[in-house]
Amino acid sequence: MSSTKQEKYGYPRVSLYALMLAAAGIPLYIHLPRFASVELGIGLAALGSLLLALRVIDLVQDPLIGWAIDRFPKAQSLFAISAAAGLALGFPLLFSVTGQGGMLRLTVVLILLFSAYSLGMILLYARSATLAKSPTAPDLMRLAAWREGGMLTGVILAAMLPALLVGMGAAGEGYGAFGWALGGVAVVAAVISYPIWQRPVIKGDKPSLQGLAQAGALKLLLLALVNSLPVAITSTLFLFFVEDRLMLTGQAGPLLVLFFLSAGLSVPLWTRLANRVGGRQALLIAMPLAIGSFVGAAFLAPGQVMGFAVICLASGAALGADLVILPALFSVSLTNAGLNAALAFGVWSFAGKLALALAAFFVLPLLQAAGFQPGEANAPEALTMLTIAYAVVPCVLKLFALALVLTLPTKEAVA
């Protein structure tokens, strides 16, 4: 396949595969707390503990997945189809779980979903050099823009789909139909994206701690973990903050779409900026935007929908920079060092999921201890704790991430 055709037809297929995977990431953490508490009667503290416990599996599983992808490069088509099949089966099963034995069934299905998600994500990111037009910094950044654009489109669709399905006549809160719809998307994405997994794999050396450190990848891994925590916390608490703290009943869906739409539209802009001034400088521009958004959210009064809409636009734009620049910097560091990427991206994948699990593990029990009850009349103390968890804690974490960015080299490969 010529490089022109590869870019014309390959990047949209990459974007579609990313769209499929996105539904098992942030949207799952957005919908799962409400589904588990309302439909299954599972407490927030119990759910938070379960999600963190599942990360113990990832601690072993994700590096093993990365090792297998590096070890068996000719099996990448099988890996890609297996990941899609796991999602196609897991989504309908997840949202058909009922209260009878719900915790056990939920655990089993989440293991299936998270395993499929890990396999697909690690494969997609590890094959950046293979899927890009060329393994150079500008083309890796361009691939990242297509990939993250697909991710954000998937997040938007998955975030708003339950409400749309209810409007079309789906029963209850639309979760049953939601599961089947996502399963169908996985099947379609697997078929259409299949050709990209037929390309010869660009191989490198086996990564080691010393090699990762010399490439600057270990520092980027720490930055990725810390930087993922703020959005993990706000994603987990978004529905609660909008409906219970701001009292904007029925507005969570449109505001969530606005947030991720802003992120998606900002991706091409951050890509151009990073290629012009460097990834480090672009992040230093984006992160204060996120910090200002968290500060603004802390001072909003109930009913201030326009104020929160502005915050969604600003914080969404800042998220776009995080999503496109950090993975590209990591991929460039590995490629320049001549290292195989799959095992390294296995650790990268674990860091991102650990952030989501840590957010659920710490903030959900914290809210429950403060007496917060979703959808109920809450005491001022409970709502204050919700504000601290949603806005103040992420602000502090983002400041820490900003400090880590300042330690990056002033001249990196993405420039």
Regions found by a protein language model. Give the residues of each.
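Membrane-embedded alpha-helical bundles of multi-pass transporters/translocases
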Residues: 2-415
